[in-house]
Amino acid sequence: MFLMIDNYDSFVYNLVSYFLEENIDMEIIRNDLVDLKYIEDLLEKGKLEGIIISPGPKSPKDCGLCNEIVKQFYKKVAIFGVCLGHQIIGHVFGAEVRKGKSPVHGKVHKIKNSGKNIFKNLPKEFNVTRYHSLIVEKENLLNDFNIEAETEDGVLMALSSKNYPLYSVQFHPEAVLTEYGHEMIRNFLDLAKEWRDKNANRS
């Protein structure tokens, strides 16, 4: 089962629907109602396959227990942050999260990506839809994270941890005008399974 941490966002059920189309089980929990012990229990019972941290209207400093979820579980289970979820991951690992030059709401921009991880087997450039006013500065992340995607003017659009199954995108993969949204979701599900399989073999 996958957990969707809902940051009180109007897009969350669009994102959920993309995941459910891949024939997975998913539970949705609001960011201030989630119980860390419940997540730990799911992990111990082998029931938790991954965590998705949804978009949301606020900031990483006002997101319920999301910061604690990332801190406590990023070494144990795959986590995928979307929009606010991306900013939360950056914030937890010491990045500056600040206002961009101007808000971008519903705008389509081209990104350049690594062709790896979330972007495996996808074109190196394609269009995504952005809804955000905050951006993550990459400078403090370079030791521990791969820069997976940026806009043409250098705004950070996606991250992955170098050592753990931690991934994030600033844009909305579930938006209609985002290209390859379903493929990115599938890639995350594959990455989550690879991590589970690798760690199961160790025990």
Where are these regions (language model features)?
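Extreme N-terminal starter segment of soluble prokaryotic enzymes
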Residues: 1-3
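Active-site beta-alpha loop architecture of Rossmann-like, nucleotide-cofactor-dependent enzymes
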Residues: 11, 58-60, 176
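Two-component/phosphorelay signaling modules centered on CheY-like receiver
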Residues: 17-25
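A short beta-strand-loop structural module common to alpha/beta enzyme folds
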Residues: 24-34
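Short amphipathic alpha-helix with an adjacent loop that forms part of the alpha/beta core around
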Residues: 35-47, 140
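Cysteine-nucleophile active-site neighborhood
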Residues: 45-121, 185-187
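Catalytic beta-strand/loop cores that center a nucleophilic Ser/Cys/Thr
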Residues: 117-163
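Acyltransferase
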Residues: 176-203
